[in-house]
Amino acid sequence: MKIPFFILHILLLQFLLCLIRCYVHNDVIKFGEENSLKCSQGNLYVLHCEVQCLNGNNEIIHKRCNDDIEKKCNGNNKCIYFFEYELRKKTQSFRNKNSIEISECVESEQNEVKTSTTCLLSNSFILDEAFIQYFFFIKNKNEEPVICKDGNINIKSALLHSPFCEIKLKDISEYIRKKCDNNKECLIDPLDVQKNLLNEEDPCYINNSYVSVNVVCNKEEEIGDESTDSSSMEIQDSTSNEQDENVKGMSSSQEMNSNNDENKNQDNESDDDVNNNNNNNNDDQDEQGNDGDVTSSMNKNEDNKDLEHGSSNDVNNNTDTLVNNKENKEFVLKEKSSLTSKINKELAHRTALFNKLADNISLLLNKKYDSFEIKDVLEDRYNEMKRDANPDVYYIYLMDTLDIEKIEDINLEEVKMSLLASLKETMNKIDTIEKKIEEFKNKYISLYNKVKTTMPELFDLNEDLVLLYNDFPFDNGMISSDIFFKYNPSENIMDHQEMVKKGSITEDELRIVNDLEPLDNYRRRKRITELRKILVEKLRILYLEKNNLFNTQASCIKSYCYKNPLNLKTLEVLLKKNYYRLKENKDYDVVSSIIQHLDNVDANKKKKWLTHERILKKLQVLIAEGYKRINEKEKDIDRRMAVYNALYEKAQSYNLQKLFNDSNDFLKKYAIMGNSFDDGDEVFGSQSSNFNIFDSNNTDQNNEQEQPKQDDQLLNNNNDDVLSESNNENKEKTSDDATHKETQEKSDQEPSQNIQEDNSDEKHAENEENVEQIETDSNVSEEANDENKDNMQTTTDEGTEELQQNDEDAESLTKENSKSEEQENEDSTDAEAIDKEEVETEEKGKDEQKKDEQKEQDEEEDGEKENKHKSSETTNETVTDIEENKNEVKGEEHLQGSEQSIEASESSQKDETKETEDKEEYVNANDDESSEEDTTPNETNKTDNGSSFFFAMSNALLVILLLLFIEFL
């Protein structure tokens, strides 16, 4: 079945119109800026939309806005819209129908909206015709499947576009083919590809991506080769003789002692020429005589398929015997040479086609661009696209890269038509060549796999053309095919002072080291171990990245400049050597050194590398850009090493430097290996390198096993320190109590001496100061008592009445005990009298707060009478009063004592007899303890009250009251 010639032209024109309308319009607008879109044919189709703005938390957020624009634009041939903030909109009295409101954003200069839009003639992805190649774009987060109305889907190519991100294009053809080929319908979602296939986390790629697809709906009975369909479009072949000469030159340069085999191949080719002529006579007249010599040679290769399959079987059979017979190396060399020469022939055909295509494009554009530059751009782009032969991809690429629409003095429509026709014919031929190369390559690899263990010396893995055929620095970040067209990077190497400058560390980076001080020993050791692991791992990655940059730089020079087989290891060593020489000597000519090296390598080859001006400029850019990135990586290493050294010094201060023994030795060795460049076989940075220090935690486990007892001792020491501190505090408290008791005993034993000393003026001055302190302390105690009284409004009155009754009962009981004490210790009467006066002063102050003024005056008169007539009785009363006042002070200072007294008062109302008996026993116990001058009551009361501070204050008050009484006497 054949498609008529005029129908083919109509379909081609329709497809060309589709390509013209399938341009994508990329926009970056600010909030408030109006964006106006219009389609001359078809309707608007929003591919993606992302809002990047500052939110209320001062954070940059990324939000998809496809739905907002689609509501206004999809299905219309023109659209006007702008974005604004929600708060500003609420202040407007009338709403603008073209506005899109974003509620999460606040005003900022960083806010912007990124969109990509195209035009579609159809509103669905239903493909009506079979055997017609459709090209269209698919939006981000697509939910509409591609459907073949007649036939099954056959994906020719698929590209993932990210126009606002660092990597703008990614080839996803294989993934889409596996998913969609031979199906009636298929859903292609760019958002799903980014998240699930590529595991992308960057919001730029997730929100700002779309897919371009080339699809054909095929039936079970397919039409023949596409190259026959395109044979109707003629392109004059004026350089056919030159191509034949190039082919012969390439074949002769790669024979390598295989003349006999080549002669056989030539005989076979001559036989096949006859077959080709017979086959061509059976074709239609429309397909006769339209192709040049290049096309005829391609047809020869196509008709040689059966012969090649036969030879491949021979190779397989022979290699099976060769594996067991090592003496037949020459035969392997012949087979290898034969396959290599065939691949070189196809590569020569491909180069000739690119040269011819570049010449035609240069003529179409009135020689605005040199044909070599166009050819170089096409070859680089072809390799970047992984040798995809889809002509539509290169049509769009050339229209954009060469700015064809801006060229003057040309008929734009004719140029577009001719450009598309030339690309379609040439790329179809190149696709056929690529398939033949793939066949030869598979046979070559099969041969290599069968002899690589027995005869590995026959294949050079560093420079083999076939084994390294697919090696290309994809997404290298240093260079791209449109260099000097879409962007013009600097060709100058970075400043020497900046190059030798070390990376500096910031205070924030040192904060992790300074945060170790407040930790205890165990946590500090654990934290230092964790930080050491993190820093060493980060340094390992940085060293690998640095060495990989040298490798990427060498690979880019080979693929974009030299474009011939080249040993990357030797070039990488040379680049590293020149880098360190340049750091030592700023006048060192790095570019000349690389050019000389490539010329020396090229001296033994017949196919020379082309030292065109564009090639040399690309070489300079690669050297400058590569060294710049390497220097930045070195500064990162310097910063990490500074943090590592600071952590090591901190560990030394805590005697934990043993944790760094293994990592220190490793990093020293790593730095030496990373900077070595004398031996090409010792280039460091291979991805296959293994480092035991990171693969296991043996070092940390050993270090932890070396000091488990030390950690236990540290923990025990910490506990002992805490206990010793508490014991010291208790000792200090007991010593303070002992000193207070000693002062009391001395005052009791020597009252007369204290009285004599108090007659001096100095003592009077000191006593005046003590009086002031007593007054302030009494005021504080009164305020505390007032607060306690406020908290106990209902119970204090009853408590005071009971306390008064208890005081009277206690006085009667203490009088009897005091009489016996007078007989035993007559010397202590004076001290007791002093204590009595002190207690009376306190009683007066307290009675004034508790009783009315009349009761207080009566008690004072009774006290004076008792002091005049019964001196002995008053001394006994003072002792009891002291004990009672102590209990009262403690009860007033502590809520617990007051609560106990209140509970006692409440219980006394129920049973007065039991209360009085309990109080008598309590007073008697206190009297016995005071007579023996024992300090245990003070300690027990202190522990019961739970505070040593108030106990010390009460003792201090007693001493001060003694001094006041002495002064009064």
UniProtKB/Swiss-Prot annotation:
CDD domains: Gal_Rha_Lectin_like-P113_rpt2, Gal_Rha_Lectin_like_P113_rpt1
Alphabetic keyword roster: Cell membrane, Glycoprotein, GPI-anchor, Lipoprotein, Membrane, Signal
Biased composition, class Acidic residues, residue ranges: 798-811, 823-841, 855-864, 918-936
Start and end residues of each stretch annotated as Disordered: 223-328, 688-947
Membrane topology label: Lipid-anchor; GPI-anchor
Claim: Signal is one of the keywords in the record: yes
Subcellular location: Cell membrane
Superkingdom as given in the UniProt entry: Eukaryota
Major subcellular location class: membrane
Biased composition (Basic and acidic residues): 300-311, 728-749, 812-822, 842-854, 883-896, 908-917
Prodomain residues: 946-969
Comp. bias (Low complexity): 312-325, 713-727, 897-907
Residues spanning the signal sequence: 1-22
Cellular component aspect of the GO annotation: plasma membrane; side of membrane; symbiont-containing vacuole membrane
Glycosites: 207, 268, 317, 360, 661, 697, 779, 876, 938, 941, 945
Listed Polar residues bias regions: 229-241, 688-705, 937-947
Disulfide topology: none
Residues where lipid is bound covalently (GPI-anchor amidated asparagine): 945
Function: Membrane receptor which tethers secreted RH5 to the merozoite membrane during merozoite invasion of host erythocytes.
Known partners and oligomeric status: Forms a complex composed of RH5, P113 and human BSG/basigin; the complex bridges the merozoite and host erythrocyte membranes. Within the complex, interacts with RH5 (via N-terminus); the interaction tethers RH5 to the merozoite membrane.
Protein name in UniProt: Surface protein P113
